[in-house]
Amino acid sequence: MDSFQFFEWLLRDIERNLLYTSLVYTNPKIAIVRYEPSENAKLWRSKELNTDSPNELLLTLKKTLDECSTLDEKIETLLRIRYFTVYVGDKSDKRNIIRSWLSTTINRLNVEEYASIQEIELQAKQWRAENAKSLRPYHYNIPINEYLRDNEIEVLDTGDNRWKSDTLQGLLPNFYHRTHTLIGAILFAVTSRLEIYSYEQKKALRYLLRTIEKCYNEGYLEMSRDRKWSHTLPELRTLTFRLYNSKVIHAACAMISLVHANPIDYEFLCQVVAVYQIIPANAAKLLSTPMTLYVGVATFSSNQVASTGNASECAPLQIENNIYVSEAQKKEWAESFKSDPLNKSRMLKLMNENLNTTLDKFSLIFNCFSSTFHVGHRIDNAQDAITDQVTATYTSNVNREMYDSYYYKLKQMLKEEIVQYVEDHVAKQYKDVTAESLSALANSSNGFSKEVKFIDRNIKTTKKILHLDNDLITNDYSDLSKALSHGIPMGTRNVPARQTRGIFILPWQVAAVQHTIAESLYKRAKKGAYQGSFAEAYTAKTASLTYGVLAEDTSKATKIILYTDVSQWDASQHNTEPYRSAWINAIREARAELKWRYDDEPKVLEMNVLDSMIKIQEYLLNSNLVVASPGSQRPTKIIRYHGVASGEKTTKIGNSFANVALIETVLDFAKTDIPDLEISHLRVDGDDNVVSINTSCTIDRLQRIIKEKYSSLNARVKALASYTGLEMAKRFIICGKIFERGAIPIFTAERPYGTDVSIQSMCGSSIYSSAVNAYRGFGDAYFSFMQDVLVPPSASTRITGRLRVLMSPVTLYATGPLSFEITPQGLGGRCRFFTQSAKLFTLFKMLTQTAAVSITPDEIKKYAETVQFKKRTEVMIASMQRKLLVPAKALARIIVDKEQQKTLGVPNVQSQKNRSQVSKAIEILGVPERNDIVAKGYYPEELYSLIISHSVVVYTSHSTPISIYRVNCEPVELLRSQLGIRIADSKPIAKPTNHLYDIVSGLSPIKISPSDLLTQAKKYDLSTYKGKRDYLSDLGLVGNTLKTYLASKMLFRDLLMSKYDDLYSTPGFGATQLTTIPLDVTSAEKVFSIRLGLPPHLYEVVMLLLLYEYIHYVFSCKRTFTAQMHAISQEQSAVITKNIILMLDNIQLDQVSFSDDAW
């Protein structure tokens, strides 16, 4: 941010955090701790500083600021504030403060109520009565005492606050602040905006706040961070508050935040909460369902899209799009609108009125759709959910001919893959794949608990890595049937609007065996095997563009687009016996046809990979699922199951293969009824599939035939067909525009947060999620509201019971254990400050670095010395050396380092690490500024400021281009208009090749990153020939490769490339917001022109650094410019170049911790 904006932002944030403190605590006392030299080491211990109330302190601060004559002095005053100490006399009445604050706020919103709420409540109650059979007791929002009276089996009483209940724990929102803290933060953010709300917004706010008040006053169940419940069971048996009260409060808070989204329908938000109170487990699903059909019948005018047929290349044209909706589709919509159980829903009414609509109106409806997911995660009891999931009923009347065709297709595909897999390994003489397979094991659960030795003590643990180490020592692992004979334990995943899903927890042997096969399948799918019908072939860095072909089809409306959804895919019949036998017979046939030597087949820990794969498949044909519910008195259930096990390494890619075989079989047989069926595009992604079809057949007949063909394979499907819109993998493509739902719930979480992460880092990830929601549709006002809610409660850290430290916003938006690790604009990294003043910048650096500490726990170091750990790394290193035929000491060290990091997955080790980091950071806060503490390294801003100070800056404005990818975010639109829109996943034109990294990653069996090369390089004296040579041969380079590389003098250049590799590898430094903007050297040259004699690879690095800083500038200042360097003399040029090279050697890049999983 430039100085003025930085000052405004800093002051506003400080003011907001102080005001929040004054509102939620009874007369807190606050003092400022400044950066001023002082003798006393523990400055914040002295209490007499705590004199002012927050408001008095703000007045004094503002007075001081008014007395400053220049902007720099004002900024200096604020940057000298290191943190505030907050002393709270009495905390017990915080809940009461919030209760009275709630009622005063409601009274200030004196507007009328909505009428339509009762209508939809009535419909929800009707639905509940009609579907009573399929609902469990905990799906009803009934008083807690009734629930406990009728469901004793669901709880285990311990006589105190530590009783257990899986089911009741699923009714907690799992937010990392107490519920009353969240209400306080919401009220704080709402109160500060009361003057600017419209009448409609006030109506919605009043309804939502009254809902919160009702639940808050009734009471609710809560669990503290140390896993104690707020009530004991005997207390609960006398209380009448409802089961879902705390979840309703959180859902209402989410809807209040969405009142700030633009565009949105306020009344619909209230309806969501109304329905949620009646049918909490089904509200989101029922309210969001109509979208799938609507996207196929709705149309609006936009532009045609041209694509090259290559998935990631598409561009909008100036021609208007074609629109076509058949009568059959309209009829289908009318029927489903009539029969929808909740057709009083505002969203459904809007849909019905807007079948022919505009882009803006569609965006409003789409935002309403996204909002239904914000009621939060649905969490069912694992036993109930898994039983529902795996029991699919089959009939025996299948079409044998189709079945055989499906089985044969699948077997042929898998056989081809296996042949390819073995041949690749034989050709490279790469037999022992142990190192690769073991390094890919994550330290997750192994399914059952086992007593193992950990350093100096025996612990019971379920962690894969510790089981593996123990099995290696006892040499008891190669009998797969023994490992699988315990049955397969189940874990769960919770998502909004869907029933809880089971996850199979398979023993580590399965993951190790399947790893290399899965890798090989993925690799081939990525290269576009089978006409590129796998979504994996489209894992471009910009997944948004991979839908180019579909965007084209929907904008031209000449093809029928068929999207099918197989219900209960994993448990369907075609996934049972045929899927498993296809694997088994594919392996047997591949072996029979090609006579390679049995000894040459890949092995993991001396187990033959293909033999073991057959064993696994045979076992899974008839497996026992063990479903326990430890927090209840339910007995453990054992279920026989034959379907696909989600939890295998090959699940997703195996599903995709089965899906291709299935859809091709269905289409082949459909051709007998529809001779002119021509397929122009087929895409599968796990169990989703989409096909574009040219045919003269009518749309309703096509749907009917496809459904028949599926059901003769015994697969139950929803087959939807349309000309102008479809849904795939949670993205909606309509009329040539791509929409993504902003459906990340912020105030609920899938699981309880661990005690081992600081509140700040959790808050950081919430801010990031809110930024993504805002960017995908809710807009900038929603994001600023979310920050007002999330930041103030997380801005302070507890020191003792009554003393808290409120940190400076600069420290909060930096990196480290007490920081959000995100910028105030929602990009990953730390906040930016652009200034020409060295003194201010040093203060800024001090603030960003005060709390940045990283500690390696002792237990990691200790475990690395044990026999168990050494055995695992020895096995891996030996396997690597068998592949490379040289000792490769540096690679061996990389293996050891990577394996050491896995020890963090052991319970308590991660907690230990985080706790010690937090306490260390707090300790550092206690040390005043000493003269010998100097801020380390250069920040990229300094490079940016250096260039800008020698350039002519011209502010520009550009016309907005037509976009295919829908966003609601001003800075992104500005950047797109200046830099254009990424239309292909093109490599930055001349990304210099890092030869060393390419050579080593080709040799190494484990995945390595450029930073690993850098770490190892520090251990050698690279100024001598011998040092260089040792370094390279330790990385595994031999013979000619080694000689040629040494002679090419490229080592230092490649190491520099390794250091800046992050600049190239993260499109938009991992932030979703930037994936559609081309961030490469070409773009940088549109903004900056530098006239300096820099060597080409340095020139690129400098340009990219400048571009990234420029992006931060646009995000915070919302304006664009171009900067051209002055004509300067040779001497000046030499001085600047020297400065730049000095900076590049010591620059500190952000470590970004949030990148969106979707990409």
Swiss-Prot record:
It is an enzyme of class 2 (transferase). Residues 545-727 form the RdRp catalytic domain. GO terms for cellular component: virion component. Its EC number is 2.7.7.48. Keywords: Nucleotide-binding, Nucleotidyltransferase, RNA-binding, RNA-directed RNA polymerase, Transferase, Viral RNA replication, Virion. One of its GO terms (molecular function) is nucleotide binding. It catalyses: RNA(n) + a ribonucleoside 5'-triphosphate = RNA(n+1) + diphosphate. It is found in: Virion. The keyword Nucleotide-binding applies. GO terms for biological process: DNA-templated transcription; viral genome replication. RNA-directed RNA polymerase that is involved in both transcription and genome replication. Together with VP3 capping enzyme, forms an enzyme complex positioned near the channels situated at each of the five-fold vertices of the core. Following infection, the outermost layer of the virus is lost, leaving a double-layered particle (DLP) made up of the core and VP6 shell. VP1 then catalyzes the transcription of fully conservative plus-strand genomic RNAs that are extruded through the DLP's channels into the cytoplasm where they function as mRNAs for translation of viral proteins. Belongs to the reoviridae RNA-directed RNA polymerase family. Interacts with VP3 (Potential). Interacts with VP2 (Potential). Interacts with NSP5; this interaction is probably necessary for the formation of functional virus factories. This is RNA-directed RNA polymerase. It comes from Rotavirus B (isolate RVB/Rat/United States/IDIR/1984/G1P[X]) (RV-B).
